[in-house]
């Protein structure tokens, strides 16, 4: 059976898994990510792969998801949370292991997982959205990524007669900015949603604005791309019991669901990408 070595590289940990064609995880290893030094970062990724995989028979590719902008040849411009730039990850791993290596942004990788494995794989088109410290997203059609330079979080939006980047207002951290603009001081998104749940008058007003901003953005993308489903994930979904039904009611033309792959999305999506691109 063919297999892919899947990597999920984050600012804290690097996860490596051996995944077969049925998207079953056969082996997995987690090591701390080395930050601040490019050479040591690359060496640590290679070391983690070697520690995790002792038998390369059947392996057709290495594939990785990373939290940064990636050129289509696997060159990473920067990993802000890892504090390294100009990273030739694909080239480095191909030389190390003599296997083709494919690298994409972690949001795109997670989108592939949702579009190919689990309950939403029956949809022809899926728009993946993650709302945490920022806003990320990707569109899949027939289980494959639609390549685009469109960065969803950098969509411009108007608020109080000023123009802002969408993620600067609607993300988890953006909620603090949105609240501050209305005279509400909060430490984080959790505190904000607690206030909403307790019907704090000012928090409810900000909440109404946030729901409208997010729903307008989803409706705009529904009109532009007509996906069969929007799959949402990210830190704000920890408060889904408070806002999710309100958001769905505010988006009558969109089919909005919660992502299903959870913590495995990065590894499963990387495996999908590897199998799709391996010759």
Q: Which residues are covered by each model-predicted region?
A:
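General beta-strand structural signal in soluble alpha/beta enzymes
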Residues: 101-105
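Adenylate-forming
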Residues: 110-116, 136-139
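ATP-binding/phosphotransfer module of carbohydrate and carboxylate kinases, centering on a glycine-rich
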Residues: 1-61, 70-73, 91-99, 113-127, ...
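A charged helix-plus-loop insertion that forms the helical arch/lid used to bind
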Residues: 76-85
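Beta-strand initiation motifs
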Residues: 23-27, 144-150
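Active-site glycine-centered loops adjacent to acidic/histidine catalytic or metal-binding residues
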Residues: 106, 132
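Short beta-strand scaffold segments in enzyme catalytic cores
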Residues: 14-18, 135-140
């Amino acid at each position: 059976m063919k297999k892919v070595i899947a990597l999920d590289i984050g600012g804290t940990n690097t996860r490596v898994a051996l995944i077969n064609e049925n998207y079953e995880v056969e082996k997995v290893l987690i090591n701390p990510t080395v930050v601040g030094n490019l050479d040591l970062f690359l060496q640590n990724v290679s070391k983690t792969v070697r520690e995790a995989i002792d038998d390369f028979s059947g392996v057709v590719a290495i594939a990785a998801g990373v939290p940064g902008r990636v050129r289509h040849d696997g060159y990473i411009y920067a990993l802000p949370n890892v504090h390294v730039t100009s990273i030739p990850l694909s080239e480095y791993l191909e030389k190390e292991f003599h296997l083709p290596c494919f690298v994409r942004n972690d949001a795109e990788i997670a989108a592939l997982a949702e579009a190919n494995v689990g309950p939403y794989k029956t949809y022809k088109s899926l728009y993946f959205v993650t709302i945490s410290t920022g806003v990320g997203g990707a569109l899949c059609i027939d289980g494959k990524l639609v390549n685009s330079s469109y960065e969803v979080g950098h969509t411009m939006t108007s608020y109080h007669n000023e123009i802002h980047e969408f993620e600067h207002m609607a993300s988890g951290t953006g909620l603090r900015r949105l609240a501050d603009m209305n005279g509400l001081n909060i430490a984080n998104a959790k505190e904000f949603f607690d206030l909403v749940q307790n019907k704090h008058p000012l928090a409810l007003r900000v909440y109404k604005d946030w729901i409208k901003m997010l729903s307008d953005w989803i409706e705009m993308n529904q009109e532009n791309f007509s996906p069969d489903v929007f799959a949402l994930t990210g830190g704000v979904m920890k408060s889904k019991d408070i806002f999710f039904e309100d958001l769905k009611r505010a988006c009558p033309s969109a089919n909005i669901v919660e992502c299903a792959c959870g913590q495995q999305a990065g590894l499963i999506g990387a495996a999908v990408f590897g199998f799709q691109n391996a010759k």
